[in-house]
C-alpha cells in the first residue's frame, strides 16, 4: 500500500516535471533563439580590445566606421572580421579615453563583413567598395555589389553586378567590376567621384577564385561617378550627361605613365587629393608595394583628374622609410598657397617574418614637394601601428584603430587625435564652432574646391621655415624644388584665396567647443579702436591745415598793423584793410617791430580808451571802410574774426576745439 502510494506520488511528480519542462524551460529556449535573431539586428558594439583594417569616412562632422577586423579580448585569434557600423561625433568635444562612439544597427540587409576596402562619400551617402573576406575561418566571397548607405534614411542600398563604361584611357565597356582589396582610395564629393588605386585580387576577394592561384597585384585605377553627377572622362548614356541611379564605372588602365614598365603594381598605399594645378585637381599616390618590392618615397605618383593621366614628381628633403599600410590626410593653408600632406605610421614587411610598425609623422608640403619630419619627441605618441585610418576635421587628425603587433594586448578604445597646426598629440578632440558643412577654411567657403577638414588650420612653424610665409600661407616656395618636366605641376598652380584678418580659430584658440567664428570680442574691440584712430588721424590732419592757414592770416594781419604804425610814426593806428572787421583785444599784442633804425612798439592797442571794454564794429555792406561804433550783435559770417583781431596768436588747441570759427575766418 505504501509502495503503491509512493508510486502514485512518483508518477504525479514526473507529470509535474514534464509540465514545468513544457511550460517554462522550452519557452525559455525559444526566447533565447529569438534573442539570437534580434541580436543580429542589435546596435553595433563600441567596446573592443583591438580594431584595424576598417573603412572610414566623414560627412558633415560625423565619422562613419564600417567593418574591418576587431577583437574583444587579448586571447582572440579568429572570427575577427565584422560588420560593425559606428559613428564618432566630431561636432562636440571628447577625450580620447572616452570618444563619443555610437553603434548603428547591423543586420542581414547590409554589406558583408569585409576589411581593407574603402568608404567613399558624397554629401548624403556612403559607398562601400572592395575589401576582403575572412581567412580565419576561411569564407567564400560573394558576388560583388556596391553598397550605398543613405544617411537621410539610415538604410543600405545594394547596387548589384556593376559593369564598366568606356572612357578616356580606360578599358573597354561592359566588363564586370571586380572587388579588390588593400588598395588606396580617395573621393572628392564636389566632383561626385571616388577612386580606388591598385590593391590585389585573390581567393578572399573574388568568388570562384581558387586558393591555389597566387594573388594578383594591380596598378589600375577604378573610378566611380556618383549618381546625379557628371564626368567628361567617361561615356554617360543619359540626356543630361549625369550618372543614373546606379552610377557609372570606369577602369583607368592606360593613363600616361600607367602602362609603362616603371609604373609598378602595388597594394597598401594611400591616395591624397590636392586642389588646383589641373582643371579638377590632382591625386597623389604614396607608399605601398607588393610581397616583393616597395614603392620609394622620393618619387611621388601624380594623377591629373581632368586628363586621366599619371605623372611622376621627385621630392626634396629627407624622405621617410619605405612602408605599407600608413594613413594620410591633407590640410590647406588659409590662402591656399600650400597644402600639407600628413603621413602617419605604417609598417615594413621586409624581410618576411620580421615586420616592424612605425609611429612617426611626416609632412609632404605641396607645391614644393618637400618632405619635413614632424618631431614628436617627449609627447604621448600612440603605439606604432599599421592598417589604421586617418580623417581630418577642424584641422585635427583623428587616427582610428591599427594593427599594433603582438606585444600590446589591447589598444582600447584605439582612437587618437593629432593637432595638425601645433604638431602635437592631444588627449582630447576639440570641436570648433562657426565652421561649415565641408569644414573648409573660412577664406575658402565660397569655393567648392576648398579642401575639407582644414577649418582653423595654421601652417606649422617648421613648415614655414622651409617654404616661407606665415601661418596663414604666403608660401614663397610655389613650385616643386625639383623642377617638373611635364603635366599639371609644370603648367598649373595652386588655388589661392584672399585671407581677411581675423582672430585664430584653431583648437588652441579657446576652450573646447568655444570656437572663434562667433562674436570675437578682441577682434571687435581692435576694429573699433582702429576705426577711431583713423578718424582721429583724418581730423588732426584737417585741424593742422586749418591752424596753418589761420596762423598765416594772423601773421599777415600783424605785419599790416606794423606797417601802418610805421607809416604814421606811431601817432595813430590807421584802419585795417577792408577784409578785417573786428576789434583788437584791449590786452594788446605786445609786439615789437623794426624797420631800419626805427623801432615801433605797439602795446595795449584798443579802439577806445579803457582796458576792459570790448565792442564790435560793423562795416558797410560794401566792405570798404569801418563804420561807426555800434552795439554788440549776434555773431555772423559778416563778423567772423573776433579771436584773430583780439590780439591773440592762434593756438593749435584752440583751432582743434573750435574749427567752425576758424573756417569762418579763412573763408572771409
Swiss-Prot record:
Keywords: Glycoprotein, Kelch repeat, Membrane, Repeat, Secreted, Signal, Transmembrane, Transmembrane helix. It is a single-pass membrane protein. InterPro entries: Gal_Oxase/kelch_b-propeller, Kelch-typ_b-propeller. Gene3D superfamilies: Kelch-type beta propeller. Residues 1-32 form the signal peptide. It is found in: Membrane; Secreted. It comes from the Eukaryota. Pfam families: Kelch_KLHDC2_KLHL20_DRC7. The chain crosses the membrane at residues 523-543. GO terms for cellular component: extracellular region; membrane. Residues 33-522 are extracellular. Kelch repeats lie at residues 62-108, 125-176, 283-331, 340-395, 396-445, 463-509. Residues 544-668 are cytoplasmic. Glycans are attached at residues 60, 251, 291. Residues 611-642 are annotated as: Disordered. This is Kelch repeat-containing protein ARB_01230. It comes from Arthroderma benhamiae (strain ATCC MYA-4681 / CBS 112371).
